[in-house]
Curated annotation (Swiss-Prot):
Organism annotation: Chlorobaculum tepidum (strain ATCC 49652 / DSM 12025 / NBRC 103806 / TLS) (Chlorobium tepidum)
Protein's name according to its UniProt entry: SsrA-binding protein
Family: Belongs to the SmpB family.
Cellular-component GO terms for this entry: cytosol
Listed Pfam families: SmpB (PF01668)
Length: 157
């Protein structure tokens, strides 16, 4: 008999593919996001982008900047600004911890992926990151190529 398939832990709606290449991720944290209904529908359809977006702390709240959400095509209400600031939902202790870490030189908050959890709620995975230098990026490419060659050799034997 086959096992009953359960719901997956989460379904990735969108991901920031360049984030792990351009930044060294030191820590990750999960945050909720405050959206309107039509924006959630657009994200479910995959019409959103996290590239070139970042999070910042302003007056004790975390805001996600430059996240592109294309307006829902069947929306009858006023259309919203596609790249408006969106509030992220975190506990105050988490915000204070992030604030202290960001005050260090060279650290920033970037969204790594957006996904729907088991309950169907949209979550954003934020990464506390430090920008990579050009030689670090080259090293990442070399390591990736070496792993790929090893996999190809393993397939042959």
């Amino acid at each position: 008999m086959s096992k009953k398939q359960g719901k997956p832990e989460y379904v990735t709606a969108i991901s920031n593919r360049k984030a792990r290449f351009e930044y060294e991720i030191l820590d990750t944290i999960e945050a909720g996001i405050e959206l309107l209904g039509s924006e959630v529908k657009s994200v479910r359809l995959g019409k959103a982008s996290l590239s070139e977006s970042y999070a910042m702390i302003h007056h004790g709240q975390v805001w996600l900047e430059n996240m592109q959400i294309t307006p829902y095509e069947h929306n009858t209400l006023d259309t919203l600004e596609p790249k408006r600031s969106r509030r992220l939902l975190l506990h105050k202790a988490e915000i204070m911890r992030l604030q202290s870490k960001i005050s260090e030189k060279g650290l920033t908050l970037i969204p790594l992926k957006a996904y729907f959890n088991k309950r169907g709620v949209l979550k954003i995975e934020l990464g506390l990151a430090r920008g990579k230098k050009l030689y670090d990026k080259r090293e990442t490419i070399k390591n990736r190529d070496a792993k790929r060659q090893l996999q190809q050799l393993r397939k042959q034997y």
